Amino acid sequence: MTKKEQALIEQYAKSLVQVCQERDTLEALQADVLAILEVFKATNLAKTLSSLAVPRAKRLELVRQLQGDNIVYLNNLLEVMLQNEREAYLYQVLLRVLSELASVSNQYDVTVTSAVPLSEEQKQRVRTVVSKRLAVKTGRLIEKVDPSLIGGFMISVNNKVIDTSIRRQLQAFKMNLK
């Protein structure tokens, strides 16, 4: 992706977040964007919208189906992107919107990797640890299971990592023995 395309994506995303922040509709925007991104993940919509083999009329129809019950500002963005023939960038714009929302609200997705699935109590404790140690609000809690950790967990938030896994401790111990 070129710098010009990245700047374009960033401009669309920042503009939408700014308007929604002024109108106090950030939570509704986040819910709508997450719902649309789920559609992208469940289907091959990103490839379809960027494919020149798919007729423009079909791409217009697909994006208009996404409009539905979204907040008006998101629907306006979708319409502007269609008018400017930039539907191929929609997926990247929506991802960037989530990133902008996180930075504006200081609320980030938390990825927890553990050897076994976490209980609800453990998930709540993770949220507490993140808010206290990293000084951020927790958005969605994304849970991953990796048996190679042996025990403990890894928390990743906004490019910050807390790693208390047994695997890391064993690696550190091994390095100390050298």
Swiss-Prot record:
This is ATP synthase subunit delta. It is found in: Cell membrane. F-type ATPases have 2 components, F(1) - the catalytic core - and F(0) - the membrane proton channel. F(1) has five subunits: alpha(3), beta(3), gamma(1), delta(1), epsilon(1). F(0) has three main subunits: a(1), b(2) and c(10-14). The alpha and beta chains form an alternating ring which encloses part of the gamma chain. F(1) is attached to F(0) by a central stalk formed by the gamma and epsilon chains, while a peripheral stalk is formed by the delta and b chains. One of its GO terms (cellular component) is plasma membrane. Its main location: membrane. It comes from Streptococcus equi subsp. equi (strain 4047). It is a peripheral membrane protein. It comes from the Bacteria. One of its GO terms (molecular function) is proton-transporting ATP synthase activity, rotational mechanism. InterPro entries: ATP_synth_OSCP/delta_N_sf, ATPase_OSCP/dsu. Keywords: ATP synthesis, Cell membrane, CF(1), Hydrogen ion transport, Ion transport, Membrane, Transport. Belongs to the ATPase delta chain family. HAMAP family: ATP_synth_delta_bact. NCBIfam families: ATP_synt_delta, PRK05758.2-1. Pfam families: OSCP. F(1)F(0) ATP synthase produces ATP from ADP in the presence of a proton or sodium gradient. F-type ATPases consist of two structural domains, F(1) containing the extramembraneous catalytic core and F(0) containing the membrane proton channel, linked together by a central stalk and a peripheral stalk. During catalysis, ATP synthesis in the catalytic domain of F(1) is coupled via a rotary mechanism of the central stalk subunits to proton translocation.
